[in-house]
Amino acid sequence: MPTVSQLIKKRRTSKTTKTKAPALSYGFNILKKKAQHYASPQKMGVCLRVTTMTPKKPNSALRKFARVRLSNGSEVTAYIPGVGHSLQEHSSVLICGGRVKDLPGVRYHIIRGTLDATGVANRKQGRSRYGAKRPKAQK
């Protein structure tokens, strides 16, 4: 434990925490031609590559992901949630933060139902997350 004189010389500093989605925390200022710090809940980007990856040890599947170049110039790996998708190279997508626990290096999710990412077809429950419209009531 520090003495009073030690605390007078150098005060206690609070620990700074790193952001979990760093690509959402800055944008690119075209006029000044440099990065500008401001946080965004989502960012738009263009798919560079759409492919699959196998998850970490206890799980087994082919998880779909896309490499996306964002509007601020950074390049990130984003997960494509839901069953089936129509994304391909040069598709416009909207991404938000949120990691996938069993895919290393994937810190972002693509938002379904916006831009070129179509919603999941025939989805009845949890539709909001997958951009699915409410089904018509049957008579």
Curated annotation (Swiss-Prot):
InterPro entries: NA-bd_OB-fold, Ribosomal_uS12, Ribosomal_uS12_bac. One of its GO terms (cellular component) is small ribosomal subunit. The keyword Cell inner membrane does not apply. The modification 3-methylthioaspartic acid is found at residue 102. GO terms for biological process: translation. PROSITE patterns: RIBOSOMAL_S12 (PS00055). It comes from the Bacteria. SUPFAM superfamilies: Nucleic acid-binding proteins (SSF50249). Keywords: Methylation, Ribonucleoprotein, Ribosomal protein, RNA-binding, rRNA-binding, tRNA-binding. It holds the Pfam family Ribosom_S12_S23. GO terms for molecular function: rRNA binding; structural constituent of ribosome; tRNA binding. Part of the 30S ribosomal subunit. Contacts proteins S8 and S17. May interact with IF1 in the 30S initiation complex. Belongs to the universal ribosomal protein uS12 family. With S4 and S5 plays an important role in translational accuracy. HAMAP family: Ribosomal_uS12_B. This is Small ribosomal subunit protein uS12. It comes from Phytoplasma australiense. The lineage of its organism: Bacteria, Bacillati, Mycoplasmatota, Mollicutes, Acholeplasmatales.
